[in-house]
Amino acid sequence: YTTLFRSGTTVVVDAGHGGEDGGTLSCTGVRESGLNLEIALRVNDLFALLGQRTRMLRTQDVSLHDTDAATIAARKASDIRARVRLTEETPKAVLLSIHQNHFPELKYRGAQVFYAAADGSRALAERLQTALGTQLDPDNHRSCKKAGEIYLLKHVSCPAVLVECGFLSNPAEEALLRTPEYQKKLAAVLCCGMLEFLEEPYESC
């Protein structure tokens, strides 16, 4: 068993997308990148209040690409590599990446957590997924999943999860995700789940 001690850990808070990369569009035309940032800022503020060290990868609606990236594709690739590098250079990091889901069929809803192959990632994802179901949305019976080709999770070596906070294609869930009240509750669930994980031993995968 390995233990992560809260006092020595930095939670890397990643608001997915940003700048010209808006991510997906909601059913009312809201950009995913903006919602990701709103939720990530709430998560970061709550961690600060609780005394947990954090590092936010972006605090504004910007991309993290290199200035010499000339095309949209090059800028997107450069941006995601920068997120990997910033996470990897953070001592004792645990990565929490915030995203939103989208699907052509409007009926799908519910937050879901994806986890990296790195030790501790699955344990963190299971804790967060359970908390999202029991404390945020009792109708959410989704299970966490191992990330497939998610570049960020595939290339970091620390415990890492990506949280799809909900489906922007579902009108009811999209409306909730835009409200400060729901964002605050979501942030509280994620923060508490993360801190519980940091204070307990986990079995190496």
Which sequence ranges carry the predicted segments?
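Single conserved hydrophobic/aromatic residue that forms the stacking wall/gate
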Residues: Y1-T3
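Catalytic-core regions of hydrolytic enzymes
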Residues: F5-A123
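A generic structural signal for alpha->beta connector loops
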Residues: G51, G110, N140-H141, S157
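Sec-exported extracytoplasmic/periplasmic mature domains
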Residues: L41-Q52, E88-K92, Q100, Q129-D137, ...
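Active-site-adjacent substrate-binding region
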Residues: G120-K146
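Active-site-adjacent mobile loop/cap segments within catalytic or ligand-binding domains
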Residues: S97, P104, H141-C205
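Extracytoplasmic/secreted envelope proteins and their assembly/folding machinery
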Residues: L37-N44, R81-V84, R122-Q129, I150, ...
